[in-house]
Amino acid sequence: MNIRMKRGMALVLTASLLLAGSAQALFGLGKSKPETVSPENGPTARDLEIRTYRGIPYLGQLEAADPDGGELTFAIVTQPKKGTVTVEGTNFTYTPKENAAGGDSFTYSAANSAGAVSLPATVTVTIEKTRSGVTYADTGEATATAAQDLAERGVFTGAKIGDKWYFEPDRTVSRGEFLAMVLETAGAEVTDVTMTGFRDDDAIPTWAKSYAAAGVAEGILRGKPTEDGAVFSCEDPISFSEAATVLNRVLDLGDVELEVWFADREAVPSWAAQAVGNMEALNVLSVGSFGSDRLETAVTRADAARMLSAAGTLLRGEKDTGLLGLLKKS
């Protein structure tokens, strides 16, 4: 895919646009280093790299593999110095201390049902300062970092009402809004157009036409086929299957072996199965956050933020997730 980069582009929705109805796993996919060495026949924990923003908790997932394929439990071995970390199941929450910035780290281990414990793995943390001037009043721990990431990178900014910013994490995302955010995340060059070529061109809002045309030109948008030709259906909610398909075309990182990786593939439409499998393998669309039983439901802003933040990390060149080399088809 040939993405042309352009600086300074942003999709900023004002309060009036948001109120009129116009137009997030994990912030920046946790980057996995090579596996740590573990005792023979025991589990192996992975080193991770994460980033968050000053004063904003990071919700992530610990990673480990066990040769027996059994259930694993996780425990913190050494606590971070610039924050605190808690573990619940496979998920962890890192909370920076007030005004903390810069580097930090903590270690964790994984244990299997037989009592074998891995050697400690290190989670390296970077706490960045916010520069956008945006601090949301309505994002919980699961969404806060991803939503902030989109604002800091000029991809999407919610509404400012009075002196407070609102992300509206439960608000449904339309096909047009998601496409616009994807193209901004990818840094695609978007130019003004008056016609898109879609049969429902008259129903596409002016702000969305340039994104629709760019999506077609870049090969990531094909529309919905009808007897009269393809339609964009800009205002329709976007489903997880559709979102995964668009992101898969943008990332273009190869295909995983579905029979090995994606056990629930038969629950997904055939046209979306490979894309969903690829995105789940990369934790852009992850089991536990977005289970396959939800793939035909509408994406919310919280969902979109987590997906786009993770995809943005990959697009910025951080492609070594520890999974790509193992999961791509030979």
Locate each region found by the language model.
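Extracellular ectodomain surface segments
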Residues: 37-77
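Sec-dependent N-terminal signal peptides
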Residues: 6-18
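Phosphate/pyrophosphate-binding loop motifs in nucleotide- or prenyl diphosphate-using proteins
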Residues: 154, 219, 283
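Acidic, turn/loop-rich segments in luminal/extracellular domains of secretory-pathway
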Residues: 62, 77-127
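N-terminal secretory signal peptides that target proteins for export/translocation
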Residues: 1-4
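Feature responds to low-complexity, polar/acidic, surface-exposed segments characteristic
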Residues: 16-42, 46-54, 124-145, 157-179, ...
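Mature N-terminal segment immediately following signal peptide/propeptide cleavage
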Residues: 150-152
